[in-house]
Amino acid sequence: ISINQDLKAITDMLLTEQIRERQRYLADLRQRLLEK
């Protein structure tokens, strides 16, 4: 495996993780707004 492939895989993983965190945050925020 080349270094470039490793970097791309790591970048993809980090982006996926960021998207998941953002979705979790938005879902949490929406839930709090609905509870008011």
Curated annotation (Swiss-Prot):
InterPro entries tied to this protein: ELH (IPR003424)
A Pfam family: ELH
Tissue: Bag cell neurons.
Job description of the protein: ELH acts as a neurotransmitter locally, upon neurons of the abdominal ganglion and as a hormone by diffusing into the circulating hemolymph and modulating the activity of other organs. It specifically causes contraction of smooth muscle in the ovotestis and expulsion of the egg string.
GO cellular component: extracellular region
Domain of life: Eukaryota
UniProt record similarity statement: Belongs to the molluscan ELH family.
Localization per Swiss-Prot or TrEMBL: Secreted
GO molecular function: hormone activity
Residues bearing PTM Lysine amide: 36
Chief place where the protein resides: secreted
Protein name, entry field: Egg-laying hormone
Keywords associated with the record: Amidation, Hormone, Neuropeptide, Secreted
BP GO annotations: neuropeptide signaling pathway
